[in-house]
Swiss-Prot record:
Keyword Nucleotide-binding among record annotations: no
Protein name: Putative manganese efflux pump MntP
Pfam families: Mntp (PF02659)
GO cellular component, one term: plasma membrane
Length: 183
């Protein structure tokens, strides 16, 4: 696969992570350590799922093609609902910061990478080329997630966004999850 095609695939796959990272970054309770772990998990699971898909390829393509969007969409909708609930309750404890939630989010934004592995990367003849391409996808996702956290830092300074960040982030995640499920 040529670099341009691989780069476009990597950017497309990382947009889920960008949206989720942006919403997480808008939350005032999120610290740098958590943001870093989210970005690392997002990148790692993009790589992992893409490489699994690339190696499993044609064997499961027929049966799993629609499930990733549904599962990922449901998880992201649930996170959106949790964010809105926290905004309404105005709690200091934040459920999206609970241990393991960053792993769940990392998996949910990366399931589609497995489908890409099934369809686009399974034709690559060499295991090293699959490893190279999937590492590239993971690294692009890592940097796109970091970009989202940097962007959210500046968006929080806008009073309306900072005040209603949980609602805005929750609504965006719900719409994003519904889009993943139905479109």
């Amino acid at each position: 696969m040529d670099f341009y095609s691989l780069f476009l695939i990597a950017i497309a796959l990382s947009l889920d992570a960008f949206g989720v990272a942006l919403c997480i970054g808008l939350n005032n309770n999120v610290d740098l350590k958590y943001k870093s772990s989210c970005a690392i998990y997002f990148g790692f699971f993009q790589f992992l799922f893409a490489i699994i898909g690339g190696y499993a390829g044609f064997l499961f393509n027929k049966y799993i093609a629609t499930m990733p969007q549904i599962v990922g969409g449901v998880v992201i909708c649930i996170v959106g609902i949790i964010m809105i609930k926290e905004g309404i309750e105005n709690e200091d404890s934040c459920k999206i910061l609970k241990p393991g939630m960053n792993i769940i989010l990392g998996i949910s934004v990366s399931i589609d990478a497995m489908v890409v592995g099934f369809t686009a990367l399974n034709k690559i003849q060499s295991g090293l080329l699959i490893l190279r391409d999937t590492l590239f996808i993971g690294i692009v996702t890592l940097f796109v997630s970091i970009l989202a956290f940097i962007t959210s830092k500046y968006l929080k300074k806008i009073d309306v966004i900072g005040k209603y960040a949980d609602y805005i982030g929750g609504i965006i995640l719900i719409f994003f999850g519904l889009k993943m499920i139905f479109f």
